[in-house]
Regions:
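Short acidic-hydrophobic, aromatic-tinged amphipathic segments that line or gate anion-handling sites
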Residues: 100-108
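Amphipathic alpha-helical interaction surfaces in cytosolic regulatory modules
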Residues: 20-99
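Generic beta-structure capping elements
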Residues: 8, 17-19, 82, 104
């Protein structure tokens, strides 16, 4: 799992690449926590670009839960561009009820 973070206008975009599984969830969690800290410090929303994420286990979902708690309502975390597999995971786990999920990172669609 690789991670990229960039500022795009008035938001931060974090992009996990590959799979978040038993071997990589700790790295994902560390990158995500750092991105939330950066978003809090800059007072910017955080968009997770899931378009390059193939799969996520329950440990990755737990990392999302912890990031939401860390954000404490001060930062909005949006999940963008999930593939069909990730959409199913988010739906089955009901994470699509916890986080805004949008089709594309580009706010204009």
């Amino acid at each position: 799992m690789d991670w990229r973070l960039r500022k795009d206008g008035e938001r931060l975009i974090g992009t996990p690449v590959g799979r978040v599984d038993e071997d990589s969830w700790r790295d994902f969690s560390a990158h995500l926590n750092a991105a939330v800290r950066d978003a809090l410090a800059a007072q910017l929303p955080l968009v997770l670009d899931l378009s390059e994420l193939e799969f996520m286990t329950s440990k990755g979902l737990r990392a999302l839960t912890m990031a939401k708690k860390q954000a404490a309502g001060a930062v909005t975390i949006t999940l963008a561009g999930p593939n069909l597999t990730m959409r199913r995971i988010l739906s089955i786990s009901r994470y699509d009820m916890l986080f805004p999920v949008v089709d594309d990172v580009d706010p204009t669609g």
